[in-house]
Amino acid sequence: MPNQPGPLSDPIHIEQLEISTHIGVPDEERLRLQRLTLGITFWPYHGARDLEDRIENTINYSAVAEAATNFVRDQSVNLIETLADGLATHLLGSFAIQKIEIELRKFALPDAKYASITVTRTASVN
């Protein structure tokens, strides 16, 4: 099954993947682990009808979650915008994904539930 761009397939979604990492602008914020959650929606090159009920014909969402967790934990950035953009680029390059949307939430504001960024990226066609 070659990875050719075409109509978007059926999306796969990972909701509220929880990760702790060092992120933030003030030094005191970066000293302690910050709780983040990720919502990751991705569109494989092949839809559910094409999978023949075989895991090797799709993208294993457990592998995506593990790659996202490892990437976030290995980063040292200040901004959630930078982290979300880097993660989207990393996952597009690591898996046969034609489009990805990531919502990254950070729980750092005392009077708000969270602050978040949503990025949407599409694989480049070579």
Question: What positions do the PLM features span?
Answer:
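N-terminal, polar/charged subdomain of small-to-medium soluble alpha/beta proteins
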Residues: 1-126
